[in-house]
Amino acid sequence: MDKVTSLDKFRIPIGNQEIELQEFVFEAGGMPLLRTRIRERSRFTIFDIDPATAAHWGKVLCAWAETQPGGSGGKEEAV
């Protein structure tokens, strides 16, 4: 059976979307993926990201956050 481990779950203050990040490991083997689940009311958007894409995306998110008022680049916990 495939293994899904929840890494974090939080709500976005504006829009109230729920974000859940999960590690998804296939029973058959292969590369683990980062599953991103975005919930808006009853609608879900789910996509899987490979490690290289996750690293690139994370760097861009942190760089942007550091340029914004109150941004910490992911150095403080989400509320």
Please give the residue ranges for each predicted region.
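Positively charged, low-complexity terminal tracts
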Residues: 1-79
